[in-house]
Amino acid sequence: MRVVAGELRGRRIEAPPGLDTRPTTDMVREATFNALNSLDLVRDARVADLFAGSGALGIEAISRGAADCTFIERDRTAFRTLRDNVAALGLDDRSKIVPGDAMVLGGSLDVDIVLADPPYDFDRWPDLLAATKASFVA
């Protein structure tokens, strides 16, 4: 998996081992960020990547000009991969990596954009949207 566009374009992002985490595909990330960029929302934005997994969404946001990203991930294996990806890409100064439940921690964040790609069986979208203080949720 690679960063699709921006300053980190083409750089590799590792996926967590196993089948518990399914990273957001390049095609989905490209479509998401094309839509966000068409609204001029990403540049200098404060972003949260909930259910972060590998961190692909938040890393893509930073690559495309977001000021910073707070990543929230509760799975220990995915958290380690996320931490390693952020370090390997030199994004420590623009990233905050928080271990924990996105549903609990996500509502307390002061950000402009919330990016969320939860597990397939996630059924709490209304709760997540109600708890989020961001201007835009994708």
Pin down the residues of each PLM region.
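Class I S-adenosyl-L-methionine-dependent methyltransferase catalytic core
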Residues: 1-138
